[in-house]
UniProtKB/Swiss-Prot annotation:
It is a multi-pass membrane protein. Glycans are attached at residues 18, 36. It comes from Homo sapiens. PANTHER family: G-PROTEIN COUPLED RECEPTOR FAMILY 1 MEMBER (PTHR11866), PROSTAGLANDIN E2 RECEPTOR EP3 SUBTYPE (PTHR11866:SF10). Receptor for prostaglandin E2 (PGE2). The activity of this receptor can couple to both the inhibition of adenylate cyclase mediated by G(i) proteins, and to an elevation of intracellular calcium. Required for normal development of fever in response to pyrinogens, including IL1B, prostaglandin E2 and bacterial lipopolysaccharide (LPS). Required for normal potentiation of platelet aggregation by prostaglandin E2, and thus plays a role in the regulation of blood coagulation. This is Prostaglandin E2 receptor EP3 subtype. Interacts (via C-terminus) with MKLN1. InterPro entries: EP3_rcpt_2, GPCR_Rhodpsn, GPCR_Rhodpsn_7TM, Prostanoid_rcpt, Prostglndn_DP_rcpt, Prostglndn_EP3_rcpt. Residues 79-91, 154-175, 254-283, 350-390 are cytoplasmic. Keywords: Cell membrane, G-protein coupled receptor, Glycoprotein, Lipoprotein, Membrane, Palmitate, Receptor, Transducer, Transmembrane, Transmembrane helix. PROSITE patterns: G_PROTEIN_RECEP_F1_2. The chain crosses the membrane at residues 54-78, 92-112, 132-153, 176-197, 228-253, 284-307, 328-349.
Length: 390
């Protein structure tokens, strides 16, 4: 998910927002509001970070990470003989595919808006592109959150109820759950097309997302409540997905710690379980931190704007609301960052760190002892780690 930015003329992005710019919102502002936004030349914000390089960099890094994750998952999936071990790989692959497709559908729009140097209405006079952009952000944003929740539930069941998991968790069931998540989110995102909710151009008039406030004076009461319902439902569904993910991950960590303490007989096995438990706990906490940082600001900000009845309409005419709308823009950027971080926190970074850990221990052992058993222990650690993930 990327926010779109554009130019309302030849003026830089930040400057045109801070000066008496007659671009995106000017026709709808009052004379007083336009006067409040007028500043002397040279007083604009630093625009060094606003560039077409931003969406291009996000696209390239996201494409590389998700494509690499899909490649590794595909190779591992074909090698696995046990069907129940494929559930985790299916979830990882589906998550990477969801993030990758979401980027490919939104980022080209971002780049076109940048390079066209025009207002959104000039590029999309019918409003269909705005609807498509908002729908895409909603579908692939919520899908990523609920796929992460499904992975957390799968992991918790594999650790806390291994016998039930082995007999009931089949590959077909995993596929059905993932497909059901995607179809359910798509049905939800189509509600504005049916008249419940609305996708609108957001502040500063250069990207589209769910409207968080009531419509204008010409809209009916049912349409206004439809907007509030849809925006609130999106925020609460996102928070629900985060809650499920956090609860299941904490339950998994607790189960791993209990199992590690139970391994008191064999010292080597106990030490190995201790390392695996620590590594897995760190990864799960990293996942929770990434999800919190990337998604909590957007979801909480949406609820705050709904409660305060703040929307893009207020940003057009009330200068005191622009700070809140700018925070909302930053929150969307954080959510878009999650698509880049997902493959790393779930798969790529863990494999890199585990192999580096084994290499360091192997070289350290060469200095301390001539034993050659450590490489086997490292291979065993990776094997046990893969087993825990599945």
């Amino acid at each position: 998910m990327k926010e779109t930015r554009g130019y309302g003329g030849d003026a830089p992005f930040c400057t045109r927002l801070n000066h008496s710019y007659t671009g995106m919102w000017a026709p709808e502002r009052s004379a007083e509001a336009r006067g409040n936004l007028t500043r002397p030349p040279g007083s604009g914000e630093d625009c060094g970070s606003v560039s077409v390089a931003f969406p291009i960099t996000m696209l390239l890094t996201g494409f590389v990470g998700n494509a690499l994750a899909m490649l590794l998952v595909s190779r591992s999936y074909r090698r696995r003989e046990s069907k129940r071990k494929k559930s985790f790989l299916l979830c990882i692959g589906w998550l990477a595919l969801t993030d990758l497709v979401g980027q490919l559908l939104t980022t080209p729009v971002v780049i076109v808006v940048y390079l066209s140097k025009q207002r959104w209405e000039h590029i999309d006079p019918s409003g269909r592109l705005c609807t498509f952009f908002g729908l895409t952000m909603t579908v692939f944003g919520l899908s990523s959150l609920f796929i992460a929740s499904a992975m957390a539930v799968e992991r918790a069941l594999a650790i806390r109820a291994p016998h039930w998991y082995a007999s009931h968790m089949k590959t077909r069931a995993t596929r059905a759950v993932l497909l059901g998540v995607w179809l359910a989110v798509l049905a939800f995102a189509l509600l504005p097309v049916l008249g419940v909710g609305q996708y609108t151009v957001q502040w500063p008039g250069t990207w589209c997302f769910i409207s968080t406030g009531r419509g204008g004076n010409g809209t009916s009461s049912s349409h206004n409540w439809g907007n509030l319902f849809f925006a609130s439902a999106f925020a609460f569904l996102g928070l629900l997905a985060l809650t499920v993910t956090f609860s299941c991950n904490l339950a998994t960590i607790k189960a791993l710690v209990s199992r590690c303490r139970a391994k008191a007989t064999a010292s080597q096995s106990s030490a190995q379980w201790g390392r695996i438990t620590t590594e897995t706990a760190i990864q799960l906490m990293g996942i929770m931190c990434v999800l919190s940082v990337c998604w909590s600001p957007l979801l909480i900000m949406m609820l705050k704007m709904i409660f305060n009845q703040t929307s893009v309409e207020h940003c057009k005419t009330h200068t005191e609301k622009q700070k809140e709308c700018n925070f909302f823009l930053i929150a969307v950027r954080l959510a878009s960052l999650n698509q880049i971080l997902d493959p790393w926190v779930y798969l790529l970074l863990r494999k890199i760190l585990l192999r580096k850990f084994c290499q360091i221990r192997y070289h350290t052992n060469n200095y301390a002892s001539s034993s050659t058993s450590l490489p086997c222990q490292c291979s065993s650690t990776l094997m046990w780690s893969d087993h825990l993930e599945r």
